[in-house]
C-alpha cells in the first residue's frame, strides 16, 4: 500500500518541514508515503468570490491530474465538513486498505478549500478537526496521525490511547 499526499502549496516554513520529515522518516518501515506538491493558484490582493472559485477550480484540476497519474487509488480529501475519524478508526481503515491492496491519494487543499469537482470524486471525505487549521500545520498533523495509526497496526508502543 502506498499513500500519496497531494498538497497545494510548496513553500513551507522550516518548522513544518522538520516536523513532517520526522514522522515521514518514522513511518517508512510501515507504510510507503510520497508527497506531491501542487502549485497554488496565483492570487489577487483583494480577491472576489468569483476569484476564489477560480482558484479552487484551477487547483482542483491540478489535484485531479496528479491523482489520474497514479491509476487506481482511493481519493481521500481533507475537508472540514468530512467525517471525523478517531485514530483507531483511521488505523482500521488503513489496515483494511492494506489487505485489499488499495493505494490512497490524500488531498490537502489550498487556502480557499477544495473544488466541488474534487469533493464529488472523493471516496472518503475526512475532517481532522472541527477547527480551521493552517495548511502548513495540517501537513504535520496528518503525517503524525498516519504514523500513529500505523504504529497501532504494528503493535508499536507509540500510541498510548485506550
From Swiss-Prot:
EC number assigned by the record: 2.1.1.177
Subunit structure of this chain's protein: Homodimer.
Family: Belongs to the RNA methyltransferase RlmH family.
Identification of the protein by name: Ribosomal RNA large subunit methyltransferase H
Localization terms from the record: Cytoplasm
Gene designation: rlmH
Gene Ontology terms: cellular component: cytoplasm
Principal location listed in the UniProt entry: cytoplasm
Amino acid at each position: 500500500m502506498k499513500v500519496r499526499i497531494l498538497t497545494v502549496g510548496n513553500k513551507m516554513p522550516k518548522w513544518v518541514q522538520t516536523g513532517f520529515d520526522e514522522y515521514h522518516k518514522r513511518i517508512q518501515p510501515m507504510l510507503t508515503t510520497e508527497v506531491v506538491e501542487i502549485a497554488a493558484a496565483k492570487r489577487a490582493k483583494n480577491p472576489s468570490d468569483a476569484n476564489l472559485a477560480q482558484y479552487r477550480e484551477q487547483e482542483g484540476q491540478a489535484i485531479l491530474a496528479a491523482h489520474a497519474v497514479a491509476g487506481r487509488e482511493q481519493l481521500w480529501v481533507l475537508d472540514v465538513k468530512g467525517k471525523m475519524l478517531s485514530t483507531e478508526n483511521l488505523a482500521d481503515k488503513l489496515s483494511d486498505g492494506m489487505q485489499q491492496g488499495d493505494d490512497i491519494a490524500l488531498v490537502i487543499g489550498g487556502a480557499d478549500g477544495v473544488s466541488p469537482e474534487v469533493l464529488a470524486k472523493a471516496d472518503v471525505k475526512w475532517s481532522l478537526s472541527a477547527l480551521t487549521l493552517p495548511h502548513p500545520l495540517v501537513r504535520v498533523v496528518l503525517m503524525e496521525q498516519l504514523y500513529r495509526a500505523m504504529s497501532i497496526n504494528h503493535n508499536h508502543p507509540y500510541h498510548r490511547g485506550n
